[in-house]
Curated annotation (Swiss-Prot):
Family membership: Belongs to the universal ribosomal protein uS7 family.
Name of the protein in its database record: Small ribosomal subunit protein uS7
GO biological process, one term: translation
Keyword presence, tRNA-binding: yes
UniProt-listed InterPro entries: Ribosomal_uS7 (IPR000235), Ribosomal_uS7_bac/org-type (IPR005717), Ribosomal_uS7_CS (IPR020606), Ribosomal_uS7_dom (IPR023798), Ribosomal_uS7_dom_sf (IPR036823)
GO cellular component: small ribosomal subunit
Encoding gene per record: rpsG
Organism: Ruegeria sp. (strain TM1040)
Function, in words: One of the primary rRNA binding proteins, it binds directly to 16S rRNA where it nucleates assembly of the head domain of the 30S subunit. Is located at the subunit interface close to the decoding center, probably blocks exit of the E-site tRNA.
PANTHER family linked: RIBOSOMAL PROTEIN S7 (PTHR11205)
Length: 156
């Protein structure tokens, strides 16, 4: 690993259909083996399903679902004198977004519907209504942070 300087962050281009950068990040995370066109097709078809189910703009629904999954606090392990404490820390905005995207995709992949489009649409609809696996993951993370509040003075 180079010690000279950190690699600069590359700008993510907005997606073709909706012109949304966050949606592009979502597609990039969903993509397997560099098959971006497949990821795009899955997302756009899932959006069509969402739009037909609840008559709202799919990008609006996507952002609302993402907001419902974003964690505000998480726990980090901190070793103090031979003991490891789970210290609650606030989550940076970029990481919030990244975690929400990752959790939504993982939850969608774990569902029982037939196609990935159906799974993704189902998970997005659940997340908008504050249910589903991704939202549960966020709640669990918050509970963990709440339970370990006593160790918050170990924050760094």
């Amino acid at each position: 690993m180079s010690r000279r300087h950190a690699a600069e962050k590359r700008e993510v281009l907005p997606d073709a259909k909706f012109g949304d950068r966050v949606l592009t990040k979502f597609m990039n995370n969903l993509m397997i083996d560099g098959k971006k066109s497949v990821a795009e097709r899955i997302v756009y078809n899932a959006f069509d399903r969402v739009e037909s189910k609840i008559k709202r703009a799919p990008v609006e629904v996507f952002h609302e679902a993402l907001d419902n999954v974003k964690p505000s606090v998480e726990v980090r392990s901190r070793r103090v004198g031979g003991a490891t404490y789970q210290v609650p820390v606030e989550v940076r905005p970029e990481r919030r977004e990244a975690l929400a995207i990752r959790w939504l995709i993982t939850a969608a992949r774990g569902r029982n519907e037939n196609t990935m489009e159906e799974r993704l649409a189902g998970e997005l609809l659940d997340a908008v209504q504050s249910r589903g696996t991704a939202v549960k993951k966020r709640e669990d993370t918050h509970k963990m942070a709440e339970a370990n509040k006593a160790f918050s003075h170990y924050r760094w």
